[in-house]
Design a protein with these regions (language model features):
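Interfacial loop-to-helix junctions that mark the boundaries of transmembrane helices
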Residues: 1-6, 53-64, 90, 130-144
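Transmembrane helix-bundle core of multi-pass membrane transporters
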Residues: 84, 91-161, 187-188
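Alpha-helical transmembrane segments within multi-pass membrane transporters and channels
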Residues: 55-102
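Alpha-helical transmembrane segments of polytopic integral membrane proteins
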Residues: 18-27, 46, 73-79, 102, ...
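Hydrophobic core segments of alpha-helical transmembrane domains in multi-pass membrane transport
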Residues: 43-47, 66-73, 101-110, 147-156, ...
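Single transmembrane alpha-helix segments in multi-pass membrane proteins
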Residues: 2-49, 80-90, 94
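Hydrophobic alpha-helical transmembrane segments
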Residues: 4, 37-41, 59-68, 93-98, ...
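Helix-loop-helix "hairpin" substructures at the membrane interface of multi-pass membrane proteins
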Residues: 10, 136-210
Length: 210
């Protein structure tokens, strides 16, 4: 049971990662392999942001900062690597090759700057634990679980209850019909990449802090 409790917070972060992959796949029908590279990059960004202060800022500030960095990174990758493919209406294979290329590029950049060194996030909280019966819950695992569940709940609301969520679902189901209904697919795709980038930023810093 203790192993299950310890794995729940990690599973919640993996859920964020999976949603980031799935939301891009739902629109463009390809697996964005660059998403994993963005997660790694955001983990490093979060680490250096925390470590650059004598007194590290509150953890939510670091999460917000890496989220914004993830959004910027995702939009940049879309602009540089994927937008031209969309304009040329190239086969899905081109997206596949472009995403692998970007993933390798990010990996090599991280290797150049950070090598094989091991970095550890500054302690976010004191290593306190609380008990429910014989089960132990650490403060950081509890925080990671809460943040992940809140983000997933917000995303679920946005996708199901807002106009942009309706537009995303419409483009995912039938891109041609959605264009006839006046939905700007370019804006929807940018929004999807921004959401995926935000999830990469959040999951990267949560994995790093864990």
């Amino acid at each position: 049971l203790q192993l299950l409790v310890s794995g729940i917070s990690l599973g919640a972060v993996y859920a964020l990662i999976a949603v980031g992959f799935a939301i891009v796949f739902s629109i463009l029908k390809f697996s964005n392999f660059a998403h994993g590279g963005m997660i790694s990059a955001c983990a490093f960004i979060g680490y250096f942001f925390q470590a650059s202060f004598d007194n590290p800022p509150p953890f939510y500030v670091t999460v917000l900062f890496t989220t914004l960095c993830g959004v910027a990174m995702a939009l940049l990758i879309d602009t540089v690597a994927y937008r031209r493919i969309r304009k040329k209406q190239a086969p899905t294979l081109y997206y596949f090759l472009a995403s692998i290329t970007v993933a390798i590029l990010i990996e090599q950049i991280l290797n150049v700057f950070f090598g094989k060194n091991i970095y550890a996030f500054p302690a976010v909280f004191s290593s306190t634990t609380f008990h429910i019966g014989s089960l132990r819950f650490s403060s950081i695992d509890t925080l990671i679980l809460v943040i992940s569940l809140v983000i997933l709940a917000i995303l679920l609301y946005v996708i199901n209850k807002t106009r942009i969520g309706l537009a995303i679902r419409a483009v995912a189901i039938n891109p041609a019909a959605s264009r006839l209904m006046g939905i700007n697919s370019s804006v929807v795709i940018m929004t999807v990449f921004a959401i995926a980038g935000a999830l990469a930023g959040i999951s990267g810093v949560l994995l790093g802090a864990k």
